[in-house]
């Protein structure tokens, strides 16, 4: 493992720009400013709502080189400066020895930021190739191996919180995947105890939309590392759910936000899980049942305007 503390170098000299370049730059800067404000607000709200980071925490920011983890690191570095509490950050990348992985990209970027970081080198690629038949999705095994390595190294580093870059859309996709394929009403929690019981995992981007993160990543110029270096086939089930949600978001603006709100407003008494609600001891004298029999009343639905997905491509940036 390579462990480095670095300082930020001098800023590179500016270049001469034409008037058209200046106009485009001004527009992008305004757009970036709006996105920055929005993402910082949502990240800060998620951290506060779930008490993700506390005084004296050492946060391992898991950095893959993708848009989500770059954005998460950027948000947390800002929070570190602005928050009323003191906490430290160490950015960690797991180099899994995938063919063609650009080993210089992340160290160069992190040295430029002046953030403490560690590069953990483990050849999980060879293990995955040996265990998974050619042409099959390797993501599941790769993810389990990666988690185990990160968790064990977190203990060695004295880390108190492990930050992952999953966002709102990941959480909704996981909800539908579990419903469709596992028969479970289960999503991806913003905060949890890790598999080994020794770490607390947090997802600071839990309230952030993937499209906002993607736009922010482009405008910020992050040096993105592609996630298909291993040659694995994309998870078809997740891809189908992602496409379904994207179509809904275009046809029915606001539906994604409403569905995510549902994750935060669960009514166990109006589901069918005896383990989540004590139906056995329910009797007519119990008047504390949430919402009572209003479930039989007609729902008051807010009408939405259907949009032709072919005619009106939409990118929403609030």
From Swiss-Prot:
Pathway: tRNA modification
Cofactor note: Binds 1 [4Fe-4S] cluster per subunit. The cluster is chelated by three Cys residues, the fourth Fe has a free coordination site that may bind a sulfur atom transferred from the persulfide of IscS.
Disordered as annotated region, ranges: 1-29
Domain of life: Bacteria
Keywords: 4Fe-4S, ATP-binding, Cytoplasm, Iron, Iron-sulfur, Magnesium, Metal-binding, Nucleotide-binding, RNA-binding, Transferase, tRNA processing, tRNA-binding
Compositional bias per record (Polar residues), positions renumbered to this chain: 16-27
Biological process (GO), any one: tRNA thio-modification
Stretches that traverse the bilayer: none
Family in the record: Belongs to the TtcA family.
Subunit structure comment from the entry: Homodimer.
Protein name: tRNA-cytidine(32) 2-sulfurtransferase
Name of encoding gene: ttcA
